[in-house]
């Protein structure tokens, strides 16, 4: 009997934000993501962003009661072809890096901050 995967992909990953407008500006203008959904949701908005080459969406939304997550470390990694080139490009746009590119046995990584103080790994290899 053939079995199928019950879970087929990661639909979205949430990034907690305090100021949704400021976060949208950061992720679209500096990171190059595109807004695909922006609709009211309670006292906030449900904002989904797409990355050009990925089916997984990024959601800029903080569930009530989880504001303590804003400004924390995102346990995941954004993949790029060349960390050093991307680091130079994003640094020129004003993106703050807390760790410059570093080569490891498994590849290269750097850590940057978004407009809300959240930290993210960017990696290749």
Feature map (PLM): residue ranges:
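Eukaryotic phosphotyrosine signaling hubs
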Residues: 10-12, 73-76
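Short, charged/polar surface micro-motifs in flexible loops or helix N-caps
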Residues: 52-57, 65-67, 83-85
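Helix N-cap motif at beta-to-alpha junctions
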Residues: 19-20, 80-83
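Core segments of cupin and vicinal oxygen chelate
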Residues: 7, 14-56
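Short glycine/serine/proline-enriched coil/turn segments at secondary-structure junctions
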Residues: 41, 67-69
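Vicinal oxygen chelate
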Residues: 1-6, 12-15, 36-37, 45, ...
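Short amphipathic alpha-helices within nucleic acid-binding modules
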Residues: 26, 84-89
């Amino acid at each position: 009997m053939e079995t199928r995967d019950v879970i087929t992909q990661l639909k979205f990953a949430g990034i907690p934000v305090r100021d949704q407008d400021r976060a949208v500006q950061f992720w679209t203008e500096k990171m190059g993501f595109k807004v695909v959904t922006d609709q009211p949701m309670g006292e906030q908005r449900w904002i989904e962003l797409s990355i050009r080459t990925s089916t997984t969406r990024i959601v800029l939304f903080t569930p009530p009661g989880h504001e303590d997550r804003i400004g924390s470390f995102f346990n995941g990694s954004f993949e790029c072809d060349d960390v050093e080139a991307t680091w130079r490009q994003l640094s020129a746009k004003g993106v703050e890096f807390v760790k410059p590119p570093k080569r490891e046995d498994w590849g290269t990584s750097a850590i940057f901050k978004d407009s809300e103080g959240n930290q993210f790994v960017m990696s290749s290899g």
